């Protein structure tokens, strides 16, 4: 049996139908200025579906149909804290710090400061604070509802799979979770 890994990030790629539809319907998490939040994970730059928005959650759950139509009955939700490897803003800051570093004699402190900045790109608190969800028509910072993202991604999958295959019980487990997630799937630890 095949159990594919489903990551939260939707690859930013012109012509990719899931990406195009998500942008068109405004289903992705936002920045404070209303633009789509961009972060890099395995496929490169991505947008995260706003699974706290009921319409976006339903849409994301429906995307499992193309996989169930291919005979797949098990799913592993991963990277759904959501994990962030880096953002364009974080990389820009590191590049600027490196430019300042290149033209001077390095010290141990300088090297450790650069190292800390590079290793701090992943899952950076500032990135989570700059990502927003649509909760009942209000913009809510991700860092205030962080634990609900993995829960709602699993909820999207669980509800979608029940609608797609009401007479089947699909295998579904998730890396990230929250209280009550057991209604929709198991947790991978």
Model segments located where?
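Catalytic-domain carbohydrate-binding cleft regions of carbohydrate-active enzymes
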Residues: 1-189
């Amino acid at each position: 049996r095949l159990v594919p890994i489903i990551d939260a990030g939707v690859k930013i790629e012109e012509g990719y139908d899931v990406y195009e539809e998500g942008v068109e319907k405004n289903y992705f998490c936002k920045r404070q200025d209303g633009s789509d939040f961009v972060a890099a994970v395995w496929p490169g730059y991505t947008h995260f579906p706003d699974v706290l928005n009921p319409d976006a959650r339903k849409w994301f759950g429906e995307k499992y149909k193309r996989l169930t139509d291919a005979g797949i009955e098990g799913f592993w939700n991963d990277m759904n804290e959501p994990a962030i490897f880096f953002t364009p803003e974080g990389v820009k800051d590191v590049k600027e710090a490196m430019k300042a570093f290149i033209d001077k004699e390095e010290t141990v402190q300088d090297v450790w400061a650069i190292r800390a900045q590079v290793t701090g790109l992943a899952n950076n608190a500032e990135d989570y604070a700059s990502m927003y969800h649509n909760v009942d028509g209000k913009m809510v910072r991700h860092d205030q509802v962080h634990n609900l993202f993995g829960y709602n991604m699993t909820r999207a999958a669980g509800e979608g799979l029940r609608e797609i295959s009401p007479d089947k019980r699909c295998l579904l487990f998730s890396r990230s979770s929250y209280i009550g997630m057991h209604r929709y799937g198991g947790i991978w630890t």
